[in-house]
Swiss-Prot record:
Gene3D superfamilies: Mediator complex, subunit Med6. Residues 204-223 have a biased composition (Acidic residues). The gene is mdt-6. Component of the Mediator complex. Interacts with let-19/mdt-13. Interacts with RNA polymerase II. Interacts with mdt-28. This is Mediator of RNA polymerase II transcription subunit 6. GO terms for cellular component: core mediator complex; mediator complex. Keywords: Activator, Developmental protein, Nucleus, Transcription, Transcription regulation. Residues 166-250 are annotated as: Disordered. One of its GO terms (molecular function) is transcription coactivator activity. The keyword Nucleus applies. Signal peptide: none annotated. PANTHER family: MED-6-RELATED.
Amino acid sequence: MMPRMGPPAAARQDNPLHVSFRNPQWPPNFINKDNVLDYFCNQANAFYEMNSCNQQIRMQNIVNRTVEECLRTMPGIQYVLWYSQPPLFIICKQRRNNVTNVSPIAYYYVINGSVHQAPDMYSLVQSRLLGALEPLRNAFGEVTNYSRYNTAKGYYWEFKNKPNVKKREEEKKEDEEEKLEDRSTNFQKTRTMMLLNQLFSEMPAEDALEREEKEEVEEEEEETLKTEEPTTSTDEPKFAEPTARTTSKQ
């Protein structure tokens, strides 16, 4: 089996956003805008490059001119103080092309003696989106559990928190005392009209009228047949009683 190709572990660089630097020999309240660059330009700081213009000035030990004046005339990578509001300091890593042209590379902030790299816009937006997607996913999953559907009501919400029994009894009493008219929603109206139209298409009114006329004719024929049938009496025939004969004496 061939070994897996890839960069060695020593060549792999950590994410600079997860790296920080702190010098325990410097107390945080001692750092100010005049010495924050000296605090940042430390060989143990992973964000500091030894081939920068700041390191050249430190090696030359220039005293007559300030660091800002020296950096204006030196092309290359430089570290300058961009913003200062103790205990927060922002340092800009830039590349000076000439006296007037400067290209920023990265920004670092020093707060309470800890040095961190400021995230770029892509990393910031990506982190915020990832942080917002998980709560949104959980919220949508929770909401779908309360969604219900009914042909009469349509879509509605049914939450687990049930109202109190007393409120239900009061609502029932109010409904019994006050007779309200039946109300219907737009969904119910449209649904009812659709069902009626479907029934009318399946059973048109003309067929219903013809059926009624046929039924009436059949009923009339049955009545006429009943009247024409001879009536048979079950009573026995009655005969006249014989009159008594009277005999006359001569």
